[in-house]
A protein has these predicted regions:
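Short low-complexity, flexible loop/linker segments enriched in glycine and/or proline
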Residues: 12-21, 99-101, 148-150
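Short, surface-exposed loop/helix-turn segments at secondary-structure junctions
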Residues: 93-119
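Short helix-loop capping/hinge segments that flank enzyme active sites or metal/cofactor-binding pockets
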Residues: 18-74, 90, 95-98, 134-144
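Glycine-rich, N-terminal phosphate-binding loop of Rossmann-like dinucleotide-binding domains
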Residues: 87
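Gly/Ser-rich, acidic/histidine-flanked active-site/gating loops
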Residues: 1-16, 50-53, 58
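Structural helix-boundary/capping segments
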Residues: 60, 79, 114, 121, ...
Length: 179
């Protein structure tokens, strides 16, 4: 059974990336914003400085896109209580604290991907302000794997209840070997 809202994953993630970068830029000085706006550097991992220098008019356009996606999620949840989604692209990984953030990579199926790709699935729901609950559902090579349970706006208890049901069905949390 495939349940999907009536917008593309790519469109939702693009909206998330633009709005997240613009929000991060709120802590920058005016000279930093101007420097980034003048930069010809392309966004790295679909998330980068080029998005951070949005003009207010552009930001409003991205906000409108967010609201349209929220409406499509609302329509989706008229037929479904929750939706199950990945949390990230892989099982749990060792955290990388090297700098810069946009230069980090993660290995996915023997291919290096931008570290920021790990944000895509939480961005899909987060950009529309949907509650989500993450529960462990198994392990790969002794590393935990989780599932994201997303639900309608302001229905946090729905996702928590679904998480409890799923945990009961799967036998609860199993501590990975070595932890």
């Amino acid at each position: 059974y495939e349940a999907r809202p009536s917008f593309t994953f790519e469109k939702a993630v693009d909206t998330y990336n633009h709005l997240l970068s613009a929000a991060e830029a709120a802590t920058w000085t005016l000279s930093e914003i101007e420097e980034h706006a003048a930069s010809k550097e392309e966004p790295q991992g679909e998330l980068g400085i080029a998005y951070a220098s949005l003009r207010h008019r552009e930001w409003l356009s991205w906000q409108e896109r967010r609201m349209q996606q929220r409406n499509k999620w609302r329509e989706f949840f008229e037929s479904f209580d929750v939706v199950l989604l990945p949390v990230t692209l892989t099982e749990a990984i060792r955290h990388d604290h090297s700098s810069p953030f946009t230069g980090r990579t993660v290995q996915v199926d023997e291919q290096k991907r931008p570290y920021t790709d790990q944000l895509k699935w939480v961005g899909l729901t987060g950009v529309s302000w949907l509650p989500s609950t993450v529960v462990p559902v198994g392990q790969i090579d002794s590393k935990p794997v989780g599932v994201q349970i997303a639900g309608p706006f302001l229905e946090d208890r729905t996702t928590l209840a679904a998480g409890r049901f799923l945990q009961e069905a799967l036998g609860g949390f199993q501590r990975p070997h070595g932890f």
